Amino acid sequence: MHLILLFSLLLFFVLMFILYGPGVYNDSDQYIKMHIHREPLYPLFLKLLRDFFGESFLYPMGIIQNVFMAIAIYLLTRTIGDRFKLPVSMEALVACIQVFPHIMTKYFSAMSVFVTNSVMSEALAFPLFTLWTMNALKLLWKGEKKHIAGTLIFSLLLSLTRGQMMVTILVFMLIMLCRVISEPQGRRKLLRILGVVAVTAALFIIRTYAVKCYNLVYNGRFINNTYGNVNLVTNMIYASDREDGEAIREEQTREFFYEIFDKAWEIEGNYSFSGDSLMDRADHIEQMHDEIKFNCIEDTFYQYYDKNVTTDYITQNLLADEQAMGMMKAIFPKCFKNWLVTYCGIVYYGLVRSIAVVHPLINIAAVGSYLLAIVLTVLLWKRNPKSPAVPMMCLALLFIAGNTTAVALTIMCLSRYMIYGFALFYLSGLMVVTELIREWHCAKINKTCTRKEE
């Protein structure tokens, strides 16, 4: 039966690729050309395929990505099935829940993308995240060294695929700290805590140097990815008033700010043009973010650099990040209140998109789902503190919170950035409900149910 499940998953994903073919989108060219803005792992994956298959590399790419996704879903399904002793029918439901986000982004999102068909880093990040989830759950349930190593490795790979996935490194740190702190008191507890922090710091350092080495080889500069500060300053400019520019001391940076602000104002790219509610603010910034970034900030910087400084693209990116940092330091204290409202609006939509689609009625249901999940998890914890569903739900909520708050700092919380937590949340909810039913059933027949500790 398990082979039938694996075959069904492989058949579904391969058929979706045959039906729709490879998806090339606005960002795809940057991955193919190993752009300075992009993390290294996915461009290297594409380069390897180009070296083997030439210009027809998109077709083996699609097959590999879809097969990888199918296998990852199968492995996570078997892990959950074994831990909760699920029948095959329940394992099939677990697999279907993991497939649904792919259907949702294809048929219910504005971009209409089947993720694992696309030339986007999400196509590699999604199966990697599924395998990270499998290892993180095993780490929570068993805590063996091989699961620590597995979670670490997949955290590093994910962070080298998408910058937002650095949050998995922090989640790993929190898992390990919780395990260490919950252990009996001992002399080595402090050393273990320091060890966890040191390993986490080392992982970030390794990630940074890996990116710099990649850029040295393929872009000729030993530097980190550029454009991060430009992303950060975009929402600050949206949340600012023109007089905030008076706080900028450096003359050229101040002139840049005024020019960018005026361009944004002309296209109504300012909080003043949004509605009063949090949803209105979120809707408006989602419409204006790219307009401000590309047509106001980027256009202003690069036109000036072309005429007065250099036409070298990487140097222009470094200068743009430097100017953006200068703006942020000066205007952030001035625009903090408006920025925070905007940020909360983006986070709100991100939390909704992590488990649903944005719609006035569905938004309320999504918030209710979070509250219900918390209440049911607490009830289960009170009945059976050792239930594996409790840490599973905690992992889901922790990742969703971390992913949403991290992405909202730099850009909009679009569905393709948020869907990683979708399956984990509903799988956790399903397991919490399953465990509660078992507990209530056992209590009803006055028997004690125990599960052998693995």
Where are these regions (language model features)?
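Membrane-interface alpha helices of multi-pass inner-membrane proteins
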Residues: 148-162, 200-206
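Membrane-proximal stem/loop segments at transmembrane-domain junctions that anchor or position
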Residues: 224-342
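Extracytoplasmic catalytic/substrate-binding loops of multi-pass membrane glycan-assembly enzymes
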Residues: 17-56, 320, 340
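Membrane-interface transmembrane helices that cradle and orient dolichyl/undecaprenyl
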Residues: 130-147
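Juxtamembrane segments of multi-pass membrane glycosylation machinery
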Residues: 44-67, 81-88, 108-113, 352-360
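Transmembrane-embedded, aromatic-rich helix segments that form part
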Residues: 150, 164-182
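Transmembrane-helix motifs of polytopic, lipid-linked glycan transferases
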Residues: 63-90, 127-135
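Membrane-interface anchor segments at the N-terminal boundary of transmembrane helices
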Residues: 59-68, 309-401
